């Protein structure tokens, strides 16, 4: 959790918290990430395990959503085929700004061992990716670490300036 200094000013005996709009909005975004899951292969099993009681994504403020219009983050887990490419782009375009993408697993990152005419060699050829998770299949702890990296990125973000996407991992 982020530790921000909050200044309290006394106004007619009532405590008033003073902070910047950036910190307030970033706090809200950091602690309420709504994730659109796009599981295509074995990595989706690990993604589902991260939402179960043993790893409990809810404590990070992560809620899995089924609608792209209600999501901030898209997690792509598995091999992306050319037939899925148009569909995943449409889902990405339906997400509200600001939006982030996590590419989970070797197949989503680079196409994995499938170098065929039907496979897209990385999700980043279709949509911009913020965080790459290596492995086959990455453990739920790795996905939790990626979410914590994304939260760290969101805490530093300014809401008034358009920032270029920067890869974290």
Swiss-Prot record:
GO cellular component: plasma membrane; respiratory chain complex I
Cofactor-binding details, from the entry: Binds 1 [4Fe-4S] cluster.
Signal peptide (UniProt feature, chain positions): none
Pfam families xrefs: Oxidored_q6
Main enzyme class: translocase
GO BP terms in the entry: aerobic respiration; electron transport coupled proton transport
Residues the record lists as binding [4Fe-4S] cluster: 42-43, 107, 136
Catalytic activities: a quinone + NADH + 5 H(+)(in) = a quinol + NAD(+) + 4 H(+)(out)
Organism superkingdom: Bacteria
Keyword annotations: 4Fe-4S, Cell inner membrane, Cell membrane, Iron, Iron-sulfur, Membrane, Metal-binding, NAD, Quinone, Translocase, Transport, Ubiquinone
Enzyme Commission number, as recorded: 7.1.1.-
Topology term for the membrane: Peripheral membrane protein
Quaternary organization: NDH-1 is composed of 14 different subunits. Subunits NuoB, C, D, E, F, and G constitute the peripheral sector of the complex.
Function summary: NDH-1 shuttles electrons from NADH, via FMN and iron-sulfur (Fe-S) centers, to quinones in the respiratory chain. The immediate electron acceptor for the enzyme in this species is believed to be ubiquinone. Couples the redox reaction to proton translocation (for every two electrons transferred, four hydrogen ions are translocated across the cytoplasmic membrane), and thus conserves the redox energy in a proton gradient.
Name this polypeptide is given: NADH-quinone oxidoreductase subunit B
Protein's organism: Nitratiruptor sp. (strain SB155-2)
């Amino acid at each position: 959790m982020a530790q921000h200094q909050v200044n309290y000013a006394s106004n007619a005996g009532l405590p008033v918290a003073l902070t910047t709009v950036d910190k307030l909005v970033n706090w809200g975004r950091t602690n309420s990430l709504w994730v659109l899951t796009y599981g295509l292969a074995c990595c989706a099993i690990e993604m589902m395990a991260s939402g179960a009681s043993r790893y409990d994504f809810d404590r990070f403020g992560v809620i899995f959503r089924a609608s792209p219009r209600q999501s901030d983050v898209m997690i792509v887990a598995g091999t992306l085929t050319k037939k899925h490419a148009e569909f995943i782009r449409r889902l990405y375009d339906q997400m509200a700004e600001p939006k982030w993408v996590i590419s989970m697993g070797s197949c989503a990152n680079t196409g994995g061992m499938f170098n065929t005419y039907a496979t897209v060699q990385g999700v980043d050829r279709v949509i911009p990716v913020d965080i790459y998770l290596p492995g086959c299949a990455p453990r739920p702890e790795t996905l939790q670490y990626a979410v914590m990296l994304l939260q760290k990125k969101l805490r530093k973000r300014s809401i008034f300036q358009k920032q270029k996407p920067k890869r974290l991992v």
